[in-house]
Amino acid sequence: VAAGVLSAEKALALTDRTGVPLAVALEQAGIDPSGVGPSPLVRRMGTFVELHVEQGRGLTAPVGVASSIWPHGRYRFTFGGEANHAGTTLMEDRHDPMLTYAMTALAANKQARLAGARATFGRLSVEPNGTNAVPSQVTAWLDARAADTQTLELLLAAITKQATERAERDGTTLQVTPESVSPIVNFPTGLRDRLVGVLDGAPVLPTGAGHDAGVFSDAGIPTAMLFVRNPTGISHSPAEYAEQDDCLAGVDALAAVLKDLAK
């Protein structure tokens, strides 16, 4: 919103899982939602450079430069079936959406590996959610990412095809709903190469994670990213880690880049 990429109206209308709009949540927190909107400070930005820990194992040097942010989408898979008793319903008589979901999760894993992409079912909702009940509905959220838009679209199509075929076999239903799809962000090559030159040939690599830099790039601001090595390759976990020397190297790199850009 501050960058002008998302309108205040759309942002304030967004709801949480309980249906509470952002505007109401802000009011409940004592914040006036009418103050939400583009920031004049963003319009004053000539260039944005973000320093961030690398969130995988792709960087072997202390500091690297980003080439792009992979496109990624989040899709809601709704599997419908027939609720029934877990103890009395014969296995061959079931219309179990959990089984369809489970096979879809395996298909997503396989298809992502074949495409050199990423596919993750990280959130699940089950109805009636009883230990002794065959579910009537399973809702699962897929996070899919790839190096380019075509690969992402083909990945989703392959997963959906296998899920649909499995649903037909299981006597269940499937509905796939895109919830958000972010396009690829290619950082300006001239700016990227300038950073590489300042940093004496630092390695260049893409990232599969979303970043603030992507938003500023979408806002039309020349944007670049610096990464600090992550020896564990782990992110979104307490095990995420970077050596102090690498962190200091990252700070030095950012300072050198900003000094060069200020010339």
Q: Which ranges hold each PLM region?
A:
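Alpha-helix N-cap and loop-to-helix initiation/capping positions
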Residues: 93-96, 187-190, 242-246
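A generic structural signal for tightly packed, nonpolar segments enriched in small/aliphatic residues
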Residues: 62-64, 79, 157, 190-194
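Short amphipathic alpha-helices in soluble, non-transmembrane regions
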Residues: 154-164
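Midchain, well-structured core segments that form catalytic/ion-binding scaffolds
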Residues: 1-150
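A short beta-alpha structural unit
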Residues: 120-130, 141-148, 173-192, 214
